[in-house]
A protein has these predicted regions:
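Short, Lys/Arg-rich, polar N-terminal cytosolic tail immediately upstream
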Residues: 1-11, 223-224
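Small-residue-rich hydrophobic segments that form or flank transmembrane alpha-helices
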Residues: 8-60, 126-168
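Hydrophobic/small/kink-forming positions within alpha-helical transmembrane segments
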Residues: 48, 67, 71-75, 104, ...
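Helix-to-loop junctions at the C-terminal end of transmembrane segments
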Residues: 75-88, 191
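Cytoplasmic-side transmembrane-helix entry/capping segments in multi-pass membrane proteins
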Residues: 89-98, 117-120, 141-145
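Symmetry-related core transmembrane helices of the 12-TM Major Facilitator Superfamily/SLC fold
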Residues: 94-101, 197-214
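C-terminal ends and interior cores of transmembrane alpha-helices
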Residues: 100-114, 213-214
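Multi-pass alpha-helical transporter architecture, strongest
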Residues: 110, 205-224
Length: 232
């Protein structure tokens, strides 16, 4: 029989919303003046290597700063959240509010065509991705989907061979892939109206998520919740 586990409701909602937000941010990056990804580093790292290979110092500097900004965001997330195990009460709210501030700060710079705005947005994405938590061995990331598609392929292959499949992992993969794709579509529509100011929308949403998470934690604490991940 497939392995059956539960993920708390707040984690389902939060994970879906954050993947949706990341989709908007990444779409805005691709449609912006540099046409680059913001929420993941695979392409950026390849382009850094290309810049080294072609001797383009300016591009190497740009991609190095983009990668470094993402890394700094992840470092900040590690310092704020501190633990990788998914659990209500972790300081996700503070991390999200900081991400919101970084995205707000990026908007006027992007509107002016400054790459510094991209670095701030990348730092925010690293901060969000650094919040990735582990639940019963499952990594829950929300800013890129390569791993999700890989996991889906593995699970489908295992199922075709008649092996046990972890249905919770499949549902998480489908959730993140679907909401990230929807966010990208919405991001494209928003960019057609707002241009580089599109990041105002994810900035507001991440701020609301941070505040909402903090209020939810207080609500659960007020009702004597233990804060265990199985609550919710």
């Amino acid at each position: 029989m497939p392995v059956l586990r539960q993920l708390p409701r707040w984690a389902w909602i939060g994970g879906g919303v954050l993947a949706f937000i990341a989709g908007i941010v990444n779409a805005a990056g691709y449609m912006g003046f540099r046409h680059q990804s913001i929420t993941n580093l695979t392409g950026s790292t390849s382009l850094l290597g290309v810049a080294f290979g072609t001797g383009d110092g300016g591009e190497a500097w740009h991609w190095g700063l983009s990668i470094g900004a993402f890394l700094i965001g992840a470092i900040l997330s590690g310092m704020i959240v501190q633990q990788s195990t998914l659990k209500l009460g972790r300081r996700y709210g503070l991390a999200l509010i900081l991400e919101s501030l970084l995205l707000f700060a990026a908007v006027p710079l992007l509107d002016a065509g400054s790459p510094v705005g991209l670095y701030l947005a990348a730092m925010g994405a690293g901060l969000q991705n650094g919040m990735a938590s582990t639940y019963s061995g499952m990594v829950f990331r929300t800013t890129h989907v390569s791993g999700m598609f890989t996991d889906l392929g593995i699970y489908i292959g295992q199922r075709l061979r008649g092996l046990e499949v972890d249905t919770l992992r499949i549902r998480v993969c489908v959730l993140v892939v679907t909401t990230f794709t929807l966010g990208s579509a919405v991001g494209a529509l928003l960019f057609g109206v707002l241009g580089e100011r599109t990041l105002l929308i994810p900035a507001v949403l991440t701020g609301l998520c941070g505040v909402g998470y903090g209020l939810y934690c207080q609500y659960k604490a007020g009702w004597g919740a233990t804060g265990d991940v199985d609550a919710g």
